[in-house]
From Swiss-Prot:
Keywords: Cytoplasm, Initiation factor, Protein biosynthesis. Residues 598-774 form the PCI domain. This is Eukaryotic translation initiation factor 3 subunit C. The keyword Cell division does not apply. One of its GO terms (molecular function) is translation initiation factor activity. Its main location: cytoplasm. It comes from Candida albicans (strain SC5314 / ATCC MYA-2876).
């Protein structure tokens, strides 16, 4: 129904409807060619809203009303009406403007106010008018008028004024506080608007005349003109770049919108992920490789950003990223001759501009396959760290480890294929992914590494010059390590690689090679000044070297290597497996992230069990030797005291039940070995179930049995050499189930090293203790001598107490002289013995010096975890 057919139409209603005119109605009013209708419409729509004018007009003219009032003669002025009335109406007639013209006039008025106040530094008024102008722009967009060209001129003018004012304010502070705040706010808003209209802003700078013509027209007219110019001037690369940025395809428009919103607050990242997934699904078969590569890179980054505030990436998102990363590699491998993604690529100013092709015709897009794989692997590690290691979820999640390893090998092959040969040893991205590959295999046994390698190379077309397809496991480790050692930029990669190699050879029962690598690397000289991750890896390699020495039968070396780290009370921290000095909730996020996942941990119970077993085999014979030669104090050391304290604590117990823990088994085995019962000791040690964690369990138990037989024989000799004059070698052979040659060899070694001084083997049948120059005393005689010495000391003390320290001074002096004479006689008796043992002692001292030097080589790295950076202390 037309608005004219409304009863009771008044000037008030007409003024209200004037603001509600639609665009189509405005065009109809402006396109009418009939002068009379125009005049009558103008007189009608031009009625003033002022109430005084309305009342006077109604009283004098007698304005008609009713349903057909516009047909009445008095309404149709100039069509037979009164001339006097017509003349008076012509004088008061106003020009009717459309909503478009009125809006443009309001915008120009705001521009005039802005221009007049910006020169006076009235920035509060300028800011208010600019905000008002922004509301006008919103109305322009709502009515499909578009943004006028003079808005770009306004932005340019304000930007120049702001720059000039900023330069003046550096020298003289003339702005008041409120004006300065308004100025800073306006400056930020102008910058934001310029970024939004950057293309038109740059075009205005180059060609301002284009914006002076028909400045009321929308910016789209400038765009159309620019596109025509670009077609005519295809050689102009700058204008071509502007045109490509200006007319973005739907794909790049979506990517640009998401890229600009990254890092901002209150952004629904899951919605962005869904948008990119739909975009990829819709264009996967019809888009160019450059567009697909851009979508994949943006999608991977947004997924990682979505989980940045979480403890770890959700499994569903992780699996999608892994699949999309594989699809991206498929795309890159299919277009390797035209497109490459590398950290060596150059960035472009606009998201939709492809990089310039190099001499080989390949366009290198800036990106990093290595960083994406690293981030994906880190998210898997964080997921394992936050999962109960004893649950089935951990086992299921650990299955993804083989998936990520396949992706790492594939990524290494691709990065290696696009890296020039002359920069291969300078490439950071290639070194990082090679190190990541080594991190995934160094702690595994050979059989598992071989299976992983075969599966990883199954679907890879490229071959590798670093590690060729089909190489043995040892060759894989050696060649990866050799490549990282040749890196010229970051020497830390080579250090990590050597420690990984030491760990690998130690785990796989190649102790001699692991030891050679460790001593040749000389990490022990400056490890305390290294970074924390390197220190942790050093401690892990050192511990694994000690375990490998134990499995190889090098008991003393294993004891030296493990001694300090087991007794440090900080073994968890030193190995990157937890915290001893703080509760888990006190650890920072960075400290927890540096911890290793559970499946890479070294079993601390196994470590302690190995160390205590080594202590048993070394210190039980030593304790027996000391107990039967109380004058030899050179054998005493801290480790003996610690182990002896465990035995003394056990002896003080009123009731001791059967062994339950690992420590109980070892203590009971020690007591049995002290008595020479090596078989009982072996049965107790072999019943410990933790030995099954070693892959070569049977060989290990056989080695332990042989060591217990040998140390049992030595303990037996030390204990009973003062009781027997001769011992039958055949009897010793039967007791300890050793061959005759082995028994003779052990006894000869004991005599040579001075453990059994003066002993002699007669016809390989007996060992005689009578040729020694030491007095052969029984145990009772030795105890009687000790008791006599203590009684003498007690008597002297009582005599001093009785005389209050002053009486019988002469008697005490005589006693002292007598004691001095006795000591001189004893010294003369021992002089011959000391001369005989001089060479042995010098040799022993040199051996001790060498052992101390070698022990210093096996000192652990002191990792300090008291701060977030996990720094080392020297």
């Amino acid at each position: 129904m037309s608005r004219f057919f409304v009863s009771g139409y008044t000037s008030d209603s007409s003024s209200e409807e004037e603001d509600l005119l639609s665009t189509s109605e405005e065009e109809l009013l402006s396109s009418s060619d009939e002068g009379e209708d125009n005049e009558s419409d103008s007189s009608f729509f031009g009625e003033d809203d002022d109430e005084s004018e309305e009342s006077s007009s109604d009283d004098e003219d007698g304005r008609p009303s009713g349903p057909a009032y516009f047909l009445k003669k008095s309404f149709l002025k100039g069509a037979g009406g009164d001339d006097s009335d017509s003349d008076s109406d012509d004088e008061g007639r106003k020009v009717v403007k459309s909503a478009k013209d009125k809006l443009l006039d309001d915008m120009k008025s705001s521009i005039e106010i802005i221009n007049s106040n910006k020169y006076n530094n009235n920035w509060s008024i300028v800011l208010g008018e600019f905000d008002k102008f922004g509301r006008f722009l919103i109305r322009c967009n709502q009515t499909n008028l578009g943004t006028p060209k003079f808005y770009i001129k306004l932005l340019t003018s304000l930007d120049n004024s702001i720059t000039e004012t900023s330069n003046n304010e550096r020298d003289d502070k003339t702005l008041k506080a409120d004006e300065a705040r308004a100025f800073n706010t306006l400056r930020q808003r102008i910058k934001k608007q310029i970024r939004e209209f950057q293309v038109y802003y740059d075009l205005y700078k180059e060609n301002p005349e284009e914006f002076d013509e028909n400045e009321d027209e929308p910016l789209e007219s400038v765009q159309a003109g620019l596109n025509d110019n670009v077609k005519n001037e295809a050689d102009n690369s700058n204008v071509g770049a502007l045109a490509s940025n200006r007319v973005l395809s739907p794909i790049f428009h979506t990517l640009k919108t998401i890229s600009e919103s990254r890092g901002k607050k209150n952004i629904d990242k899951l919605e962005q992920i869904a948008t990119l997934e739909k975009l990829l699904e819709a264009n996967v078969s019809k888009s160019s490789p450059f567009e697909l590569i851009s979508i994949y890179q943006m999608l991977l980054s947004v997924r990682f950003d979505a989980s940045s505030n979480q403890a770890f990436m959700p499994l569903e998102q992780w699996q999608k990223n892994e699949q999309d990363l594989g699809k991206l590699l498929d795309l890159l491998e299919a277009n390797v001759d035209t497109y490459q993604v590398s950290e060596l690529g150059s960035t472009t100013d606009d998201i939709d501009i492809e990089p310039v092709a190099n001499a080989q015709g390949v366009k290198v897009i800036f990106g990093s396959i290595t960083s994406s794989i690293d981030r994906l692997d880190d998210e898997l590690t964080k997921s394992l760290q936050h999962t109960d290691p004893h649950s089935t979820e951990y086992v299921e999640r650990l299955k993804d480890e083989s998936t990520i390893y396949n992706l790492i090998v594939r990524g290494q092959a691709y990065v290696e294929s696009i890296t020039p040969e002359d920069v291969k040893y300078k490439s950071e991205q290639l070194a990082r992914i090679v190190l990541r590959r080594l991190e995934h295999i160094y702690y595994k046994p050979k059989q598992l590494i071989k299976a992983n390698e075969e599966e990883a190379w199954r679907n890879i077309e490229y071959n590798s010059s670093i590690v060729s397809k089909g190489s043995s496991v040892d060759e894989v480790i050696d060649q990866l390590t050799e490549f990282l050692q040749k890196q010229q930029k970051n020497k830390t990669y080579g250090k990590h690689a050597i420690l990984f190699s030491i760990y690998y050879y130690a785990v796989n029962s190649q102790y001699e090679k692991a030891k050679e690598l460790f001593l040749r690397s000389q990490f022990y000289s400056n490890i305390n000044s290294a970074e924390s991750s390197l220190q942790v890896q050093y401690n892990r390699a050192l511990v694994q070297l000690g375990l490998s020495a134990f499995r190889a039968g090098s008991i003393e070396e294993s004891h030296k290597i493990l001694n300090e780290i087991v007794n440090s009370q900080r073994s968890k921290e030193l190995l990157g497996q937890g915290f001893n000095s703080k509760f888990p909730n006190q650890a920072t996020v960075l400290e927890r992230q540096k911890l290793l996942p559970f499946h890479q941990h070294i079993n601390l119970e196994l470590l302690e069990c190995v160390f205590m077993t080594c202590s048993l085999l070394i210190e039980i014979p030593t304790l027996a030797a000391i107990a039967n030669n109380h004058k030899d104090s050179k054998r005493k050391n801290a480790s003996l005291k610690s182990f002896k304290s465990k035995l003394d604590f056990h002896d003080r117990q009123f009731f001791t039940g059967p062994p339950e823990s690992i420590k109980d088994h070892i203590v009971h085995a020690s007591i049995a070995l002290q008595k020479g019962d090596w078989l009982k000791s072996y049965n107790l040690l072999s019943s410990i179930k933790i030995w099954k964690l070693f892959p070569d369990n049977d060989k290990l138990l056989a080695m332990m049995k042989n060591q217990l037989q040998i140390e049992g024989l030595r303990t037996y000799i030390f204990t009973y050499k003062s009781v027997f004059k001769k011992l039958s070698i055949e009897k010793l052979q039967q007791i300890f189930q050793l061959s005759k040659d082995e028994v003779v060899s052990i006894l000869e070694k004991m005599i040579t090293t001075g453990n059994v001084s003066g002993g002699e083997i007669i016809d390989n049948k007996f060992i005689s203790f009578t040729s020694t120059t030491e007095p052969q005393r029984s145990k009772l005689q030795e105890l009687a001598i000790v008791l006599n010495e203590k009684i003498q000391l007690l008597t002297e003390k009582n005599e001093k107490t009785q005389s209050n320290g002053y009486g019988k001074k002469q008697q005490n002096k005589d006693q002292q002289n007598q004691q001095q004479q006795n000591q001189n006689q004893n010294q003369q008796q021992q002089q011959n013995q000391q001369q005989q043992q001089q060479q042995q002692s010098s040799q022993q001292q040199s051996n001790n010096i060498l052992s101390e030097e070698s022990a210093n080589k096996f000192r652990y790295a002191n990792v300090n975890s008291n701060n977030d950076e996990f720094q080392a202390t020297a």
